[in-house]
């Protein structure tokens, strides 16, 4: 079986060596072929030299696809997804650190390689020096309970840097265009929930490095800073519109393959703004299209 890690880099000279060392130190099954596929998004620091140095030292493991300015982590990962030829595909951020058993424990969690599956784990939250921080998972966006398709349409509860997918899922997802996509990992999660299975490994298998340059982070959903940012009416209205656009775009890509039940869940959500205000609120409440905290639910009911 070919195990492939997709590593997207951009100006990551401060952390990428440590991450690459953790990937190369992964415990492996002797029967597996192990590879790391890297795409650099036009870094202007020492990142290109660092990753080329690792490729020269580990030519049978590390491949760098031709450099191209992607402009975002999402676009960079989409390039990697299109270039991937792995049987099991892991997604990796340049600034995290993987525990040695990350790959093996994730592989063991898959139930099937014939139907679409996505496996994700918990994570340790760490500072810039990888010192583990005390964190209550119930207060973070890493925490989830009772995931449903309705909940996943309004909020991604799964950290993209912890996920792996099988070939069946990636082949099903891949296309030339992804209308309305908010993030590549959210899209993968939606596909897994709609057409396959999401599997949770309850062990903390990576250290998620919390620092000022994180593009998306493990947010404290009950902090005053986070709450105040989600009371901004203009931002909330735009965010809600983006959620509806993503659901509609996803449905336009795969709706003809959905079960009638899942198709109705998508249609019920992305057509919300075609209803009057009271009907929108009732549809969200009765349908279970609800975010994870009271503040966020109130915001979405007002501005969706």
Please report, for each region that a protein language model flagged, where it lies by residue.
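C-terminal subregions of glycosyltransferases and related glycan-biosynthesis enzymes
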Residues: 181, 209-304
């Amino acid at each position: 079986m070919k195990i492939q890690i997709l590593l997207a880099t951009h100006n990551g000279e401060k952390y990428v060596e440590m991450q690459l060392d953790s990937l190369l130190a992964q415990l492996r099954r002797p029967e597996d072929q192990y590879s790391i596929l890297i795409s650099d998004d036009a870094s202007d620091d020492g990142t290109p030299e660092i990753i080329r140095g690792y490729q020269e030292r580990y030519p049978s493991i590390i491949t760098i696809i031709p450099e191209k300015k992607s402009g975002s982590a999402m676009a960079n990962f989409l390039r990697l997804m299109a270039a991937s030829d792995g049987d099991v595909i892991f997604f990796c951020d340049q600034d995290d650190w993987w525990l040695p058993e990350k790959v093996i424990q994730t592989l063991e969690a898959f139930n099937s390689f014939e139907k679409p599956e996505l496996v994700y784990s918990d994570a340790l939250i760490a500072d810039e020096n990888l010192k583990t921080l005390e964190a209550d998972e119930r207060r973070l966006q890493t925490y989830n309970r009772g995931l449903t398709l309705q909940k996943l349409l309004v909020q991604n509860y799964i950290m993209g840097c912890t996920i792996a997918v099988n070939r069946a899922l990636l082949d099903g997802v891949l296309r030339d265009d992804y209308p309305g996509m908010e993030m590549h990992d959210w899209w993968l999660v939606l596909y897994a929930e709609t057409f396959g299975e999401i599997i949770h490994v309850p062990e903390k298998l990576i250290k998620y490095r919390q620092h000022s340059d994180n593009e998306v982070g493990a947010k404290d959903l009950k902090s005053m800073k986070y709450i105040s940012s989600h009371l901004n009416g203009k931002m909330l209205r735009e965010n809600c519109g983006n959620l509806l656009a993503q659901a509609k775009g996803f449905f336009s890509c795969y709706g003809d393959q959905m079960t009638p039940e899942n198709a109705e869940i998508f249609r019920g959500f992305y057509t919300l703004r075609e209803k009057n205000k009271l009907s929108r609120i009732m549809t969200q409440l009765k349908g279970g299209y609800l975010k994870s905290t009271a503040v966020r639910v109130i915001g979405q009911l007002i501005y969706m």
